From Swiss-Prot:
<feature type="domain" description="Calpain catalytic">
    <location>
        <begin position="85"/>
        <end position="352"/>
    </location>
</feature>
<dbReference type="Pfam" id="PF00648">
    <property type="entry name" value="Peptidase_C2"/>
</dbReference>
<dbReference type="InterPro" id="IPR001300">
    <property type="entry name" value="Peptidase_C2_calpain_cat"/>
</dbReference>
<feature type="active site">
    <location>
        <position position="309"/>
    </location>
</feature>
<dbReference type="GO" id="GO:0004198">
    <property type="term" value="F:calcium-dependent cysteine-type endopeptidase activity"/>
</dbReference>
<dbReference type="InterPro" id="IPR036213">
    <property type="entry name" value="Calpain_III_sf"/>
</dbReference>
<feature type="active site">
    <location>
        <position position="156"/>
    </location>
</feature>
<keyword id="KW-0645">Protease</keyword>
<dbReference type="GO" id="GO:0006508">
    <property type="term" value="P:proteolysis"/>
</dbReference>
<keyword id="KW-0788">Thiol protease</keyword>
<dbReference type="GO" id="GO:0004197">
    <property type="term" value="F:cysteine-type endopeptidase activity"/>
</dbReference>
<protein>
    <recommendedName>
        <fullName>Calpain-like protease palB/RIM13</fullName>
        <ecNumber>3.4.22.-</ecNumber>
    </recommendedName>
</protein>
<dbReference type="GO" id="GO:0071467">
    <property type="term" value="P:cellular response to pH"/>
</dbReference>
<dbReference type="GO" id="GO:0001410">
    <property type="term" value="P:chlamydospore formation"/>
</dbReference>
<dbReference type="GO" id="GO:0044182">
    <property type="term" value="P:filamentous growth of a population of unicellular organisms"/>
</dbReference>
<comment type="function">
    <text>Required for the proteolytic cleavage of the transcription factor RIM101 in response to alkaline ambient pH.</text>
</comment>
<dbReference type="InterPro" id="IPR051297">
    <property type="entry name" value="PalB/RIM13_Calpain-like"/>
</dbReference>
């Protein structure tokens, strides 16, 4: 018999695709050759016209096995595996009219493997037992289909979606093959980015009383084929008949592929375009449903509405909505609604007008905008964009899983959220998110709180991975720690922040972005070649290229750099400890080098109190020749380790003498009251003892800290 052989042929072909997706080319070839072997066997005995089409497809597939595959192509097949045991392959298009959903690929005699039914081992009702039902009634009469209802199983969203699809004249029966008595069936559902085949049998949980765990029609009790679609749906949801619910927009998408839109209702107001939506509904271009919020039992009884329940919209006229309850109870089957305060969501599913352009991608939860997946799209006219988070083994996890879509009006990759004008932003814990873009060029940034797989689909325009505006990109990771966290520029410790040398050898356009913890900022200063490797010693506004306010978590700025040297200082307003990341995107190559955080290779410090004096001598000894000494003198009013710009501080100066000869080495006559301290730099030619003379303009009190850094060891005397 050819049918079982074709089922086996398809099984090996699908396995070949799956192995190829995980880069096991050897096994992919083995499976493909096995499918060719089966096909050749069938061709010798059965004159099926489809054999030629299958042969050509399989040979083409074999020839392509050594060609590289994109990650997106691989994920289409990898996403067939929701668990280790399950496999829901994409429907293969052999030619325009022939797919792997054809009944030729279903062995109607051999039963389904027991392993495929594991999720149905437990039932929500102990009285229910699985029984095999032979399905001989394949009636597609809309009258009986409109009378489908839910009973014990809390799947109002599924049943309401089914009813809405019937109202839209979508031939949902065609999702099943074969449409005759069989040991197993294929149901095609749209999930994880593709139309996929789900294999089920007709064993259903039957109750000993008149209650039901499956979808039924109260006007045709022998109509069981809708329950096959329901069983396939429950299979991919992962909990079988222990179903906890979904929403109507999601379910209608899975059943029909129509694009799901969820409109949140507030203050009892329907959207202003509700009449236009209903007009589209009457034209068969959308399906519509509505969902209640949380209602008390008393209020539910008064309103004839169910708490947290989805209804099909049956009619809209003169501000009154007629809804159909998916439950059986005839008295509450159709309800007229004038007050919408108790409804939370409007569900609209749009018939797609265009074939989607799709991209599959893996998501790893990472911080910062520039690390997120980004896609640029050019829309010539209004375009629907659908983001789908894939079903997986962890989809039913109790912890919330949200995803973000941020759309910016630019064609370039985003470094920080403030870099370009934001067009829209959506955050949702729903698995599917639909947005509409106006004509224009946009970059879409996607993020989530958990690792997962996504499919992004565009229904009227192609998109591509976003690229930075300029060709050259540098990324720098750093931190503010206990030694290097100077705070904002109004603090005396500002110069203790991380600092960098930047060199531009030619005129350069530069976009700089920064992400970090806390209120963050960066400042870029003009510098010179002779200060390479030297830290700035004050906040010199005359050399400052940019000024912007501190911002939470991110910062960005754009520059046009002329050839030269620059100093970059990154800071956190409150001197908090944390990490930061810099991204520098430039039109020409630039170099960025971190400046050492200390005065020298060897560092010592000395603290003293002024005690109503105005002079202090500090003796120290160098231990090597040509000692490059850098000295910083800082004043403090108390025990705090920083001063503010508004704090009192005396003007000070410092001079250096040879201790033995008393000859001056460096004399400074000018007093300086810089917030950031007084500095003295000198090269001491020989290892000797020296005197540092520190003076203040007037006698007084307070504390003074002297830091000495040197390329050779220095000893305080």
């Amino acid at each position: 018999m050819p049918t079982p052989c074709l089922e086996q042929f398809l099984h090996h072909l699908e396995k070949s695709h799956l192995y190829l997706s995980i880069d096991n080319t050897k096994q992919a070839k083995k499976e493909c050759l096995e499918s060719i072997k089966i096909l050749n066997s069938i061709a010798k005995t059965t004159p099926l016209p489809e054999i030629k089409v299958l042969s050509q497809y399989t040979l083409n597939h074999y020839e392509s096995l050594d060609k590289p595959r994109t990650i997106s192509d691989k994920l289409e097949w990898i996403s067939s595996k929701l668990t280790q045991e399950t496999f829901f392959p994409p429907v293969i298009q052999f030619n325009e009219n022939f797919t792997s959903h054809n009944e030729l690929f279903v062995d109607t005699i051999s039963p389904i493997q027991d392993n495929d039914n594991k999720i149905f081992e437990k039932l929500p009702n102990k009285l229910a037992k699985f029984e095999y039902i032979e399905i001989s009634n394949w009636d597609n009469d809309i009258t009986h289909l409109k009378n489908l209802y839910q009973d014990i199983l809390p799947n109002c969203s599924f049943v309401s979606s089914f009813l809405a699809i019937i109202d839209a004249n979508i031939p949902i029966i065609d999702t099943i093959t074969p449409q005759k008595s069989s040991q197993k069936y294929k149901v095609s559902l749209r999930f994880n980015g593709a139309l996929r085949n789900v294999i089920v049998d007709s064993k259903f949980p039957i109750m000993p009383n008149s209650r039901n765990l499956i979808i039924k029609s109260y006007s045709d009790t022998e109509l069981y084929w809708p329950a096959l679609i329901e069983k396939a749906y429950l299979t991919i949801m992962g909990n079988g008949y222990n179903f906890s619910g979904s929403n109507m927009a999601n379910d209608a998408y899975v059943l029909s592929g129509w694009l799901p839109q969820i409109i949140k209702l507030s203050n009892g107001q329907l959207p202003s375009n509700i009449d236009d939506l209903w007009r589209l509904r009457t034209q068969g271009k959308v399906t519509m449903g509505i969902g209640t919020g949380t209602l008390s039992k008393q209020l539910s009884s008064q309103l004839h509405l169910v708490s947290g329940h989805d209804y099909v919209i049956d009619n809209i006229k003169d501000g009154v909505i007629t809804v159909k309850n998916p439950w059986l109870d005839p008295k509450d089957r159709v309800v007229e609604i004038k007050n919408f305060n108790h409804f939370k969501y409007l569900y609209v599913n749009w018939k797609p007008d265009h074939k989607p352009y799709q991209h599959y991608f893996l998501y790893q939860a990472k911080p910062n905008t520039y690390n997120q997946p980004q896609f640029t799209i050019k829309c010539m006219e209004e375009t629907w964009i659908l983001l789908e988070r894939h079903l997986s083994e962890t989809s039913s996890s109790p912890s919330p899983h949200w995803m973000d879509m941020n759309v910016f009006e630019t064609e370039y990759k985003i470094i920080t959220p403030s870099q370009y004008k934001k067009y829209l932003s959506v955050e949702t814990n729903n698995r599917l998110q639909l947005i509409k873009l106006k004509p224009g060029v946009f970059t879409i940034v996607i993020s989530s709180n958990k690792p997962c797989r996504f499919t992004l689909s565009s229904f009227n325009a192609m998109f591509s991975k976003s690229k930075y505006k300029y060709d050259y990109t540098e990324t720098v990771n750093g931190e503010w720690n206990s030694d290097i966290n100077g705070g904002n520029w109004a603090m005396s410790t500002y110069i203790n922040n991380p600092q960098y040398d930047i060199i531009a050898k030619q005129t350069t356009e530069l976009i700089m972005g920064m992400h970090g913890q806390g209120q963050i900022n960066f400042h870029l200063f003009h510098s010179s070649s002779d200060s390479m490797g030297e830290r700035i010693q004050n906040f010199d506004k005359t050399k400052l290229i940019n000024y912007q306010n501190y911002n939470a978590s991110y910062q960005s700025s754009s520059y046009r750099l002329t050839p030269g040297h620059y100093k970059l200082v990154v800071s956190e307003y409150y001197r908090s400890i944390g990490t930061y990341q810099l991204v520098l995107n430039s039109s020409e190559p630039i170099t960025i080098t971190k400046i050492p955080p200390f005065l020298g290779l060897y560092n010592i410090s000395k603290s003293f109190n002024w005690d109503n004096t105005n002079r202090f001598k500090l003796k120290f000894e160098t231990t090597g020749y040509n000692s490059k000494v850098k000295i910083k003198i800082a004043y403090f009013n108390g025990e705090s380790d920083f001063e503010l710009q508004t704090s009192y501080r005396p003007a000070m100066r410092a001079s250096l003498f040879n201790s033995q000869t008393k000859q001056p080495i460096q004399i400074n006559e000018q007093f300086n009251d810089s917030l950031y301290g007084v500095f003295l730099h000198e090269i001491l030619p020989s290892p000797e003892e020296y005197i540092l003379l520190i003076e203040r303009f007037e006698i007084g009190y307070g504390r003074c800290v002297v830091e000495i850094g040197c390329n050779n060891k220095v000893i305080l005397k």
